[in-house]
Amino acid sequence: VILGINTGGKKEALTIQVGDNESSKYWLSVLNELKNRGVKDILVICADGLTGIKEAIGAAFPKTEYQRCIVHQVRNTLKYVPDKDRKAFATDLKTIYQASDEKKALLALEHVTGKWTPKYPNSMKRWKDNWDVISPIFKFSSVVRKVIYTTNAIESLNSTYRKLNRQRSVFPSDTALLKALYLATFEATKKWTTTIRNWAQVYGELSIMYEGRLPE
């Protein structure tokens, strides 16, 4: 599922896809479908480390920034950390992604890496490897950052889909599955009637950051 925020500050479920062959070719077809349906521009795409997504974005929407999902980045880091250290480790990770600018974030990254790597050798490798797609977040204010990396809406949808899966574990075809997903999405998105919090401030900042790409 791809969730977007329109220029009016409201959330929209843009597309639902069923596929098991994630690649740059696959994601390019998904993004091109959005273009064909009228999506003219995307400022930022926030996603997990999906195979080929960065290349597909560059081809379909060359001006769009790809931001690695911070929530998934943190989850992947803590995946193999035992409970006794997880809370302290998570608190230290916050010093990276909640830093006021990239320079301070890099200092925090070095500190956290030095502290935890001796105990969990591979835990911080993905942060350094993925820094080019983690770091775009630091040019935004805290208000805009929350819009970009808050996953409440998408997690709510995913929870709806998991509930659907528990109710019926087998679907006779992809078409049957898509129909069920569309109905569940339609019901879930009925509640999306309000604008994003602090949208006027967010819109103003984005208008300056991405000059000429948003309506006056």
Q: Model-derived features: where do they sit?
A:
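A short, charged helix-loop
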Residues: 18, 77, 88-92, 96, ...
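RNase H-like nuclease fold core
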Residues: 1-46, 51, 55, 60-63, ...
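Conserved beta-strand -> loop -> alpha-helix junction used to position metal-binding or nucleic-acid-contacting
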Residues: 44-51, 56-92
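Hydrophobic/aromatic-lined pockets within catalytic cores
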Residues: 35, 39, 58-62, 82, ...
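Short, conserved catalytic/metal-binding motifs centered on acidic residues
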Residues: 11, 45-48, 69-72, 127, ...
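A generic short alpha-helical patch detector that favors 3-5-residue windows
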Residues: 19-23, 45, 66-69, 81-85, ...
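Acidic/histidine-rich catalytic cores and adjacent linkers
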Residues: 95-216
